[in-house]
A protein has these predicted regions:
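C-terminal motif of bacterial Sec signal peptides marking the signal peptidase cleavage site
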Residues: 17-19
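Blade/loop signatures of beta-propeller domains
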Residues: 23-55
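Short beta-strand elements that form the blades of beta-propeller/WD-repeat-like
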Residues: 32, 75-80, 121-127, 162-168, ...
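Beta-strand-rich domains and repeat architectures in extracellular enzymes and scaffolds
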Residues: 50-84
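Blade-loop segments of beta-propeller domains
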Residues: 56-60, 94-120, 127
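Short coil/turn segments at the loop-to-beta-strand junctions that recur within blades
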Residues: 59, 100-108, 147-153, 189-194, ...
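Repeated scaffold domains used in trafficking and secretory/extracellular systems
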Residues: 65-68, 110-114, 150-159, 193-201, ...
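Conserved blade-ending motifs and adjacent loop-strand segments that build the rim/top face
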Residues: 230-246, 303-327, 333, 339-340
Length: 378
């Protein structure tokens, strides 16, 4: 009997510890980071594998430019604005289908601003004046959703379950329910020069998350509004409330103002740092930032409670040139990145024997753009 009691106590204690660890891992409300405490980081400290995707090239699926790319499981979704075409490939490069419905008909779009793919692979294409074109996971047209004119413009779309979130450059958010057509509008902040709410929203599991402009807060977007989820704490390098107020009163929107974000971030400037994007995977919480006139990466390992802070990896990789989606950073060749701040992302050291495949594809002017997937550790 004593032996059974003893074993029962051990098992219960073990389960209690496991539950506590999971609770700590999943409910960190404030991630504290010292931006000056840099970490020598290899790309292989963060990734399980790297895939070079040779996108199939034929007349039916030629890509002029990649304006947006997303990944869901083993499928890549690409929007080519130059051709007003949406293309779908497997992650091994094989071609699946193309949507090219530009026109003036009732089931045709005139211009696509952004797209989102649901958990089931359904595709939602957004026009900047508020029309959504919904397609099946095979690329078959299903319906056109005409939103009410409640936003200045409709610039980004994110879909989860029956929820559609629209982000406007004006600083507003529209929540739309697919199930009953109801909607709610929420105001984020006043429109400002240089600082925009675009590319600040990400999807983690079933949640649509948004990072605030200046105070490092991560919000979950719901039908009730923005609910605080967690935040970054950069200690002495947090932006002060006083400086944020000074800045927001100084840069009210003026379309003729030519200032850029880096005019306001850095030593002697209103902001000490600025988060371009914050995203989350099963293993990491990630911030891609501007700090001391340079790009900075912050990776917080939720499992090991370890922080990685670096400008570049040991292999010279910079994830600021990538798109994050589905536990993966996606790199694709963009002409502007080659000379922009002397950025280098792809080296022989990280690709190994796949480097020749990459360079051959890159140098082949007749092939589709090269796509590389950095699969983060689970």
């Amino acid at each position: 009997m004593n032996t059974i009691k003893y074993l029962t106590i051990i098992i219960l204690a073990f389960l209690f510890v496991q539950c506590c660890e999971k609770n700590i891992q999943g409910n960190e409300k404030r991630i504290t980071i010292d931006l000056e405490e840099r970490t020598e980081t290899s790309v292989f400290d963060l990734t399980d594998s790297i895939t070079v995707v040779p996108l199939h090239t034929s007349d039916s699926c030629l890509i002029a430019t990649i304006n947006q790319i997303e990944k869901k499981k083993d499928t890549l979704y690409i929007y080519d604005m130059q051709q007003s075409a949406f293309l779908c490939f497997k992650t091994n490069g094989s071609y699946l289908f193309r949507i090219s419905d530009k026109g003036n008909g009732p089931e045709e779009y005139q211009h696509i601003e952004h797209f989102s793919v649901s958990e089931t692979g359904e595709i939602f294409l957004l026009e900047p004046w508020g029309n959504i074109y919904q397609y099946s996971n095979k690329g078959v047209f299903k319906q056109k959703i005409k939103l009410l004119h409640v936003l200045e413009s409709y610039n980004e779309i994110y879909v989860r379950g029956n929820s559609i979130i629209i982000i406007s450059v004006s600083g507003d958010i529209l929540y739309y329910s697919l199930s009953d057509g109801t909607y709610q509008c929420f105001h984020l902040y006043e429109r400002m020069n240089a600082f925009f709410p675009i590319k600040r929203t990400s999807i983690y599991n079933d949640s649509i998350m948004n990072v605030s402009l200046f105070d490092n807060q991560i919000y979950k977007i719901t039908q009730e509004g923005l609910i605080p989820s967690w935040s970054w704490d950069f200690k002495d390098n947090n932006n002060s409330e006083q400086n944020i107020k000074k800045l927001t009163s100084r840069i009210t929107y003026n379309p003729n103002d030519k200032s850029v974000l880096t005019d306001y971030v850095g030593k002697g400037k209103p902001l000490k740092q600025f988060i371009y994007t914050s995203c989350e995977s099963n293993r990491f919480k990630i911030a891609l930032m501007e700090y001391n006139n340079s790009f900075l990466h912050v990776f917080h390992d939720k499992m090991k409670h370890k922080n990685w802070v670096f400008k570049r990896t040991k292999e010279n990789t910079i994830f600021h040139t990538c798109t994050y989606t589905d536990n993966t950073f996606i790199y694709y060749d963009q002409p502007f990145t080659r000379g922009w701040r002397n950025l280098t992302c792809i080296t022989e050291e990280i690709l190994g024997d796949k480097y020749n495949v990459y360079t051959n594809l890159k140098n082949d002017s007749d092939s589709n753009p090269t796509v590389i997937l950095f699969h983060l550790k689970e």
